[in-house]
Structures are given as C-alpha cells and as structure tokens.
Amino acid sequence: MGTVQAQAGGTEKAFIRNHTDAEVTWGPCPAFLPKGCELAVLHGDPAKKDADVLLKVPGGSVLAHHKHTSPERIVLLSGEMTVRYDGQQPVRLRPGTYAYGPAGLAHTATCFSKHSCVLFIAFIEPVDAIPVAH
C-alpha cells in the first residue's frame, strides 16, 4: 500500500500496510509453535518496547499453551479462531474482532479456518512467547 508523507515536522513517516502486501517480510515463529507459523514486524523493534507484529497461523493449527511478558492487543485480520485464556471461557474470533491479553496470562488458540488466520498484535513490552506446561 506504500508510504504516506507525514504532515508533522518529525523524521518518522506514516505508512499503511496490509498483511498481503509484498513489503511485509515474513519470518519463522518460535520452534514450539506450529509448522508454517510466520511472524512479520510492522513497526518498531521486537526486542524493544512498543512493537507491532503480524502473526500468520496455518489453517487447522493449534498455537501451543504459552504466555507473554507484555500485554497484547490483538485484531484478527483473516480466518476464524478460538482463543482460550486460562481460567476463562473460550472466545471465538472472526475478522475484525479485538482481543486483549494481559501480561503473563497463559493461553492457547486454534485456527479452525481452511486457510491461514492472520492477527495484528501490538506489544507494549518486547515481543516474546514463552511455552507453558498445560
């Protein structure tokens, strides 16, 4: 979709991306997540605070039980999935659904679509995914 010139006097430029854009560079997920899972950094440095990423999960895959040291703000962009946070009822996400996951709250998710599920995730703290025994 390209870059849009910022109106303010700063050096940072505004930009717009879609998960299908050629400018989006996908890389592998941590090894404990399903084969074919991919991550892409949209903005920021995932080793630092305030990074935005895309997560692509193959259809029919389960994200293993895990947690993050950061809260995560999620919007499902494509596909359908169920998220199960520990101690809470499972929630079904459809495209456009927003979900908030507190730091340290373990969860699992299932992409039950035929095609991949793609999520936008905003992290406050550095990006991580820590496996948790179920």
Protein language model regions, located:
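Ligand-binding loop in jelly-roll beta-barrel domains
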Residues: A103-V127
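Short, low-complexity, Pro/Ser/Thr/Gly-rich segments in the mature regions of secreted, periplasmic
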Residues: V127-A133
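Glycine- and acidic-residue-biased ligand/ion/polar-headgroup-sensing regions
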Residues: P58-S61, H68-G87
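Conserved hydrophobic/aromatic beta-strand scaffold that supports enzyme active sites
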Residues: L39-V41, D52-L54, R73, Y98-Y100, ...
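A short, N-terminal "cap"/entry segment at the start of jelly-roll beta-barrel domains
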Residues: V4-A51, H134
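Extracellular/periplasmic catalytic domains that process cell-envelope and extracellular macromolecules
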Residues: F32-K35, P46-K48, H68, V75, ...
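Conserved short histidine dyad/triad with adjacent acidic residue
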Residues: H43, K49-H68, P102-A106
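Short acidic-glycine-tyrosine-enriched beta hairpin
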Residues: D45-A47, G87-G104
